[in-house]
């Protein structure tokens, strides 16, 4: 896949965007890095419930950004490795691990090259967090990488934005994008979701929509078994301006509007 010239160009464009935004995210209010360093947990309760006890288990976090979720798993006793294609993000993750005194391994690599970058190591858990798959053009190749990274009996845990929510317009519940699109959507937007007013220069990104059927088929074709699947009617950020913020920090539709799935999660195991 990465031998395709277009894919390589898209990845490099996305990498430049993420590289530029790392210091904005590390120092901004959205991620609250001081609070995290002081002990704040960044994982969602449903993630902890569905993953279960990680004490003593090996866990690799793909597309880990600057490592908050990775290190949250480490604080729970997992032996963690974080991987991301952004060198500045990995530098920030390593600095955070050193600052809080947590043993963690962070590696710079494209996710498609993860097995080689990690020396063909295998893990008990492959964790993929919210907002990951839209950055990948080929989920079938991604699922094969996941399967290579899992030891027999290990499992993938994926938590992500629901593709249904991704096809809707930014200001309404009107369908604006194709659910079954095969080409990436090109965006050109200054700032970042963490700070809309931030001054940035690398503002172009490419995102790929992936239908649930595409994700499920890729995971099954890689030889994994889907053990559980859940959909959620809330988001972790104001996806639309009319969403209501609840006391638990989630964002939900007003009571007079129909609900739509905004997130999903699944767990898929590799046969022992």
Model-identified regions with their sequence ranges:
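Acceptor-substrate binding/catalytic loop of class I
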Residues: 160-174, 199-214
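Class I SAM-dependent methyltransferase SAM/SAH-binding core
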Residues: 57-116
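A short glycine-rich, Lys/Arg-flanked "PGG" loop and its adjoining helix->strand segment in the class I
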Residues: 140-155
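Short alpha-helix
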Residues: 205-229
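A short acidic, Gly/Pro-enriched loop at the edge of an enzyme's catalytic core
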Residues: 116-126
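A short SAM/SAH-binding and catalytic strip from SAM-dependent methyltransferases
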Residues: 124-140
